[in-house]
Amino acid sequence: MLDDFKIDPLVKNKSPSSTTVVVAMSGGVDSSVAAALLHKLGYKVIGITLQLYNNTSGKGGCCGSTDTQDAKQVASSMGFPHYTLNYEKAFREEVIENFIDTYTQGKTPIPCVKCNQVIKFRDLLNTTKSLGADVLVTGHYIRKVEQDDEIYVYSSKDTKKDQSYFLFATTIEQLKFLRFPLGNFHKDNIRKLAKYFNLSVAAKPDSQNICFVTDTYKNTIAHLRPQTVKKGHIIDTNGNILGEHNGIVNFTIGQRRGIGLASKEPLYVTKLNPDTNEVTVGPKSALLQNKLHIEDINWLLKDKIPYSGLSVKVKLRSSHSGSTAIIYPNDMNKATVILQDTYCTVTPGQACVVYDGDRMLGGGWIC
């Protein structure tokens, strides 16, 4: 069966037996298979799991106490070493606090991107280097190709599981050290391989939720920072007061359900104003836009975005199939994106990820 899972050498001109690989093991099936496969192929595998928070509920997240035990069991059954590193303090300070800050600013965060950006691909990558390992491997569904001293990043062959959207902030320097061996395979086959290896996580469900949110994100914010949940007005697009809300952290742009207003026509959240603590609602027509601005851009091409604009495809959320657009650079690592064929809900705090076909070019945060 292993003949169906051939991968390119992780390090050029270096045999598997002389290549030390750190695999970031979340306790899920994907990273477990990545570690097991590389071990079977002869690589010197070291499994590392990051203890990010204390959660034993097992409610569809990752990197909690139960997941750590799952990863440890996989490593033990396959016969390679495994270590757990406690990153709870860094995770709380840089991911959870950022998550709350973003909501209180009237934006909708993506904590998984932030975790990849500052915990896995910064701190863990540095730890990997300090161990003398050759590469850091993850179970993400994304493809990376190095050719002519340039790095190309592509969507996964399994488009339903593609995770390139969540890795847009990964820098070229980080990508040089990272490997994604599952990018050319489909999830169904990865589960078959997990069964072939007799891994205890072979039937484990995919993580669906934000890992540290065991109830709802609203209750999580109310518990961790209750002073941020303040009552305020719900207004229409003309500024008329329609009702009262229990905190702007309970709303996201584009939200329709749970607004708490009775109306003949559907109402959507069109704006969140943290300065006045107001939630603006209106018809869907007031929500759709074809122009957006992004900041903190991570650009993977050697050539910068031309001032005349670049024709691209953009994804404004992970499930978005993509829209044709033109991106124009601005000062201070910002850009303007003009959608060409459609109007979309533009949600500040989310990511706008830029593609040329299935090649990811980079992206930025919607502001």
From Swiss-Prot:
Any one GO cellular component localisation term in the record: cytoplasm
Amino-acid biosynthesis keyword on record: no
Keyword Translocase appears in the UniProt entry: no
Principal subcellular localization: cytoplasm
Subcellular location: Cytoplasm
Reactions catalysed, as given in the entry: S-sulfanyl-L-cysteinyl-[protein] + uridine(34) in tRNA + AH2 + ATP = 2-thiouridine(34) in tRNA + L-cysteinyl-[protein] + A + AMP + diphosphate + H(+)
GO molecular-function terms, A-Z: ATP binding; tRNA binding; tRNA-uridine 2-sulfurtransferase activity
Binding site for ATP: A24, M25, S26, G27, G28, V29, D30, S31, L50, G139
Disulfide bond entries: C115-C211
Entry's EC annotation: 2.8.1.13
Active site, per annotation: C115 (nucleophile), C211 (cysteine persulfide intermediate)
Keywords tagged on the record: ATP-binding, Cytoplasm, Disulfide bond, Nucleotide-binding, RNA-binding, Transferase, tRNA processing, tRNA-binding
Gene Ontology BP terms: tRNA wobble position uridine thiolation
Ranges annotated as spanning the membrane: none
Residues at the site labelled Interaction with tRNA: H140, Q350
The protein's enzyme class: transferase
Region (Interaction with tRNA): 161-163
Signal peptide: none
Family: Belongs to the MnmA/TRMU family.
NCBIfam families assigned to the protein according to its UniProt record, in alphabetical order: PRK00143.1 (NF001138), trmU (TIGR00420)
Task performed by this protein: Catalyzes the 2-thiolation of uridine at the wobble position (U34) of tRNA, leading to the formation of s(2)U34.
The protein, known as: tRNA-specific 2-thiouridylase MnmA
Species the sequence originates in: Ehrlichia canis (strain Jake)
Lineage: Bacteria, Pseudomonadati, Pseudomonadota, Alphaproteobacteria, Rickettsiales
